[in-house]
Amino acid sequence: ATPILRNHLGVIIDLHAAPGSQNPWEHYAKVQMDVYGQAT
């Protein structure tokens, strides 16, 4: 068997911030802007 199978290794791919994912922000939290365009 290959080393990956022999050692029971796996891969988890996280696409929560990928283009076209659930939301348009880089991370899960929504960024809010004040009246001057500054992130709050």
UniProtKB/Swiss-Prot annotation:
Query: Which named protein is this?
Result: Glucan 1,3-beta-glucosidase
Disulfide bridge positions per record: none
SUPFAM superfamilies named among the record's database cross-references: (Trans)glycosidases
Identify the domain of life: Eukaryota
One GO term (biological process): polysaccharide catabolic process
List the Gene3D superfamilies hit by this protein, alphabetically: Glycosidases
Q: Which UniProt keywords apply?
A: Carbohydrate metabolism, Cell wall biogenesis/degradation, Glycosidase, Hydrolase, Polysaccharide degradation, Secreted
Q: Any one cellular component term from GO for this entry?
A: extracellular region
| Top enzyme class | hydrolase
Write out the catalysed reaction. Answer: Successive hydrolysis of beta-D-glucose units from the non-reducing ends of (1->3)-beta-D-glucans, releasing alpha-glucose
Grouped into one coarse class, the protein's main location is: secreted
In which family does this protein belong, per the annotation? Belongs to the glycosyl hydrolase 5 (cellulase A) family.
What EC designation does it have?
3.2.1.58
Q: State the organism named in the record.
A: Pseudotsuga menziesii
Localization in the cell: Secreted
What GO MF annotations does this protein's record show?
A: glucan exo-1,3-beta-glucosidase activity
